[in-house]
Curated annotation (Swiss-Prot):
One Gene Ontology term from the biological process aspect of the record: cytochrome complex assembly
Gene it is expressed from: petG
Subunit-structure text: The 4 large subunits of the cytochrome b6-f complex are cytochrome b6, subunit IV (17 kDa polypeptide, PetD), cytochrome f and the Rieske protein, while the 4 small subunits are PetG, PetL, PetM and PetN. The complex functions as a dimer.
Membrane topology designation: Single-pass membrane protein
Function (record text): Component of the cytochrome b6-f complex, which mediates electron transfer between photosystem II (PSII) and photosystem I (PSI), cyclic electron flow around PSI, and state transitions. PetG is required for either the stability or assembly of the cytochrome b6-f complex.
Stored NCBIfam families: PRK00665.1
Stated name of the protein: Cytochrome b6-f complex subunit 5
Family note: Belongs to the PetG family.
Alphabetized SUPFAM superfamilies for the sequence: PetG subunit of the cytochrome b6f complex (SSF103446)
Pfam families: PetG
Sample GO molecular function, one term: electron transporter, transferring electrons within cytochrome b6/f complex of photosystem II activity
Key words of the record: Chloroplast, Electron transport, Membrane, Photosynthesis, Plastid, Thylakoid, Transmembrane, Transmembrane helix, Transport
Segments crossing the lipid bilayer: 5-25
UniProt xrefs under HAMAP family: Cytb6_f_PetG (MF_00432)
């Protein structure tokens, strides 16, 4: 079955995605740029 592989990919990608968002927001905060949201 593919489910163990799929769940492993999801469990691996979710923390990386969240960490990436935090790092991006932190770097933008450090540079003092106005976020274009």
């Amino acid at each position: 079955m593919v489910e163990p592989l799929l769940s492993g990919i999801v469990l691996g990608l979710v923390p990386v995605t969240i960490a990436g968002l935090f790092v991006t927001a932190y770097l933008q905060y450090r540079r003092g740029d106005q976020a274009t949201w």
